[in-house]
């Protein structure tokens, strides 16, 4: 038994390979000593002649044994399924993949039954591999049974707890097929205010966004580079950018590819919200008769993106459902429609779109488009946090440590919140810059004998939060510099922020 580690496999899962002495002899006799994957034709013939003779001998032994058994127990009692033929064994042999497709050995195995058997066996193998991969993704576990968190951090606090998402019963997306949106009870806004949220796939295009890096974005940058190198005199020979966008849209709309349509809708929505790019496109269209103004071009692009996103959302594409819900909640199409955003977020959350799971939790927490429900908000936050969502880890850590959103104020819950804040701090960014600040407040005072006070580490966490853009941490560092490095350990800001009087606690319980 030999143990090898495949470096190309994500997570470096151990791969166990076992081989016997017969395989070693075949490899040493049939293959070149330089490489087992580079075969010369004489070596191939020699190898396959030895293999075929070995298989044929084993087949003769099997037929002789079969005749003896059939003579003793009768022909009818024998199994109907015969032994695998030489062709079947040849097609199922693992080293068959090494040979080229147009090899002379294929002339011996052109039987229809063998080819159909080969296709079935390959199809079943592909289905098994795909099912294993999908089960690993859904379960969040690696091939060796370990959790995905074991690669870089300690397991989450609620790893062993089963988290089941509960969705509202009135998840109605009829407005996707109703452009006017008139008179539907689902279209009523329970809250007309929007909320500034950290999101991985957002409409804030000033921040690097992996999902917004489409092929058309790259083409736009290449177009600018070409214009720069051509100069002012020769740039007229280059096709205007607006023409290329129109041509790209015509081709995409004729196709039935969902991802291509989503990329196009995302790009034109990005262009429609970028004032600088709109002015560049308007300047290119000044010489034409059907020139647009900035406002009319923006309205045209945004409405076109809205139509495409509605069609994709109606067929259940989760990325389109999230982006359309984000546009509704941000007021891109005019009035803020939180009810529609909530329905789209919850629909995408059913399809395991993690950012939509987090946004659904925010809707339940703040009452955006739905009645406030603290248990459901915590439920969705917990699910998103177990899937490595930084903002969900941060919020769940704060709520657990300070006993908010109906969570118990006991030691176990506090320690769970402390662990969630540690995990959120390890993944902190400019979007989630409050996690190091909250963890620093905990280390500044400590908690009983479970969390030892460490002011030096707390100051390092304040510096990390301030570098990410947290203003309160920057203020604390400035006060510490003025006082000669001394920071008060009595009442950290978070303790004052989340401290509740008895009347406030009673009101919060009634609300929950």
Curated annotation (Swiss-Prot):
SMART domains: SEL1 (SM00671). Induction: During sporulation and at high pH. GO terms for molecular function: enzyme activator activity. Keywords: Cell wall biogenesis/degradation, Cytoplasm, Membrane, Repeat, Sporulation. Its main location: cytoplasm. Residues 101-113 have a biased composition (Acidic residues). InterPro entries: Chitin_Synth_Reg, Sel1-like, TPR-like_helical_dom_sf. Sel1-like repeats lie at residues 318-353, 354-389, 390-429, 433-470. Residues 101-122, 144-164 are annotated as: Disordered. Pfam families: Sel1. It is a peripheral membrane protein. PANTHER family: CHITIN SYNTHASE REGULATOR SKT5-RELATED, PROTEIN SKT5-RELATED. Belongs to the SKT5 family. Required for the activation of chitin synthase III (CHS3) activity during the sporulation process. This is Protein SHC1. It comes from Saccharomyces cerevisiae (strain ATCC 204508 / S288c) (Baker's yeast). The gene is SHC1.
């Amino acid at each position: 038994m030999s143990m090898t580690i495949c470096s190309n496999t994500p997570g470096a899962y151990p791969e166990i390979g076992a081989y016997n002495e017969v395989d070693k002899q075949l490899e040493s006799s049939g293959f070149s000593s330089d490489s087992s994957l580079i075969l010369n034709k004489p070596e191939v013939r020699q190898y396959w002649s030895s293999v075929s003779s070995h298989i044929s001998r084993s087949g003769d032994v099997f037929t002789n044994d079969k005749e003896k058994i059939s003579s003793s127990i009768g022909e009818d009692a024998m199994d109907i399924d015969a032994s695998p033929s030489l062709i079947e064994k040849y097609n199922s042999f693992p080293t068959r993949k090494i040979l080229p497709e147009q090899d002379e050995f294929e002339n011996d195995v052109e039987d229809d039954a063998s080819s159909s058997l080969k296709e079935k066996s390959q199809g079943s193998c592909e289905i098994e591999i795909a099912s294993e991969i999908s089960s690993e993704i859904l379960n969040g576990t690696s091939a060796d049974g370990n959790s995905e968190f074991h690669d870089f951090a300690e397991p989450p606090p609620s790893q062993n707890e089963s988290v089941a998402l509960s969705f509202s019963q009135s998840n109605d997306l009829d407005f996707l097929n109703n452009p006017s949106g008139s008179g539907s009870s689902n279209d009523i806004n329970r809250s007309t205010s929007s909320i500034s949220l950290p999101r991985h796939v957002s409409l804030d295009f000033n921040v690097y966004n992996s999902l917004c890096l489409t092929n058309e974005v790259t083409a736009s940058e290449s177009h600018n580079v070409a214009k720069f190198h051509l100069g002012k005199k020769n740039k007229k020979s280059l096709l205007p950018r607006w023409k290329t966008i129109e041509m790209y849209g015509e081709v995409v709309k004729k196709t039935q590819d969902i991802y291509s349509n989503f990329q196009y809708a995302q790009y034109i929505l990005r262009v429609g919200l970028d004032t600088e790019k709109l002015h560049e496109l308007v300047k290119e269209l000044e010489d034409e008769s059907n020139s647009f103004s900035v406002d009319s071009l923006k309205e045209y692009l945004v409405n076109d993106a809205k139509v495409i996103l509605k069609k994709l959302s109606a067929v259940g594409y989760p990325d389109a459902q999230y982006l359309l819900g984000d546009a509704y909640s941000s007021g891109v199409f005019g009035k803020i429609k939180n009810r529609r955003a909530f329905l789209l977020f919850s629909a995408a959350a059913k399809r395991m779109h993690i950012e939509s799971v987090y946004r659904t939790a925010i809707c339940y927490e703040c009452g955006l488009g739905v009645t406030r429900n603290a248990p459901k908000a915590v439920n969705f936050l917990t699910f998103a946090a177990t899937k490595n969502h930084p903002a969900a880890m941060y919020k769940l850590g704060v709520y657990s440590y300070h006993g908010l959103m109906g969570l118990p104020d006991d030691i176990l819950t506090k320690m769970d919140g402390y662990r969630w804040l540690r995990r959120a701090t390890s993944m902190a960014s400019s979007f989630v810059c409050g996690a190091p600040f909250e963890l620093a407040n905990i280390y500044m005072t400590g908690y009983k004998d479970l969390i030892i006070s460490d002011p030096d580490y707390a100051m390092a966490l304040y510096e990390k939060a301030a570098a990410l853009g947290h203003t309160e941490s920057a203020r604390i560092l400035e006060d510490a510099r003025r006082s000669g490095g001394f920071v008060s350990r009595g009442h950290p800001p978070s303790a004052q922020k989340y401290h509740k009087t008895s009347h406030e606690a009673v009101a919060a319980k009634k609300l929950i």
